[in-house]
């Protein structure tokens, strides 16, 4: 089964499933709304700080948040906040196969377990690519609207953060897919996945890093989050990585492969 057919298979399964379409629409809406409202929020914040002469002067001197070169990393990091929405989409797409017994029917109809996994991976790839395209279009629009520099070299400098964001979404969705194959029930999977990725691992790595001085780059969520690093400290004259680090890509990519392998292992090992 080729990639086109696996994509078509997923499309026919969920094209009329309203919760799937609602979550997808919510992701696009939140993504665009947050990007388009940043300028208004900054203007509001500036107005609130008018009495603070030092901070007001610093802010009014110009933070190049929307300038080309800076905008790609800034938006890519902000957009990662919403990666849980497509993750829930993937969880639902997998767990629904178990609850409605469609996975068993697909296998009976001649679809191999490998092809079934590829159909889910094709959905992940499509969502990740569309997320990167959405980020590119939003960044291009905001940059052309607010950036004082609009020459072609400046526009495409640091464009690698768009691809990095796509990779971050892809690996995170692979993790969500593994969780869905592991627990098989949508409600349980969403709760446990959210708890681990948003609470348990971040708290654990913070304690290990700052109290015990451990290196935490090998934890899965930490590795995924490191692909696009927090950029805003540079506006307070602190050092930040203003480019995508190859080691971050390799570690996160390795986790993506691990999640795919574990998903396939679970699919092969368990009865349907």
Give the location of each predicted region.
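Central hydrophobic cores of alpha-helical transmembrane segments
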Residues: 23-28, 189-200, 216-220
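Junction motif at the cytosolic side of a transmembrane helix
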Residues: 251-272
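Membrane-helix interface segments
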Residues: 18-20, 112-114, 118, 154, ...
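Secretory targeting signals
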Residues: 26-93, 117-184, 198-210, 222-253
């Amino acid at each position: 089964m080729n990639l086109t057919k696996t994509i078509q298979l997923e499309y026919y399964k969920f094209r009329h499933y309203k919760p799937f379409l609602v979550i997808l629409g919510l992701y696009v809406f939140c993504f665009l709304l947050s990007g388009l409202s940043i300028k208004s929020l900054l203007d509001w914040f500036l107005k609130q700080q008018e009495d603070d002469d030092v901070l007001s002067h610093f802010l009014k001197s110009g933070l190049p948040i929307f300038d080309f070169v800076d905008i790609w990393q800034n938006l890519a990091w902000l957009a990662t906040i919403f990666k849980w929405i497509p993750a829930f989409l993937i969880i639902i797409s997998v767990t629904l196969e178990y609850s409605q017994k469609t996975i068993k029917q697909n296998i009976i109809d001649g679809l191999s377990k490998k092809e079934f996994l590829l159909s889910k991976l094709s959905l992940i790839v499509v969502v990740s690519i569309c997320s990167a395209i959405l980020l590119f279009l939003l960044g291009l629009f905001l940059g052309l609207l607010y950036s004082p520099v609009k020459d072609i070299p400046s526009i495409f400098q640091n464009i690698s953060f768009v691809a990095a964001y796509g990779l971050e979404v892809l690996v995170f969705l692979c993790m969500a897919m593994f969780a869905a194959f592991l627990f098989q029930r949508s409600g349980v999977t969403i709760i446990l996945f959210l708890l681990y990725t948003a609470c348990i691992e971040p708290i654990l790595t913070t304690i290990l890093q700052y109290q015990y001085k451990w290196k935490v780059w090998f934890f899965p969520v930490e590795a995924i989050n490191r692909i696009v690093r927090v950029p805003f400290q540079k506006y307070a004259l602190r050092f930040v990585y203003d480019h995508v680090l190859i080691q971050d890509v390799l570690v996160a990519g390795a986790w993506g492969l691990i999640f795919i392998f574990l998903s396939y292992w679970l699919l092969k090992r368990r009865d349907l």
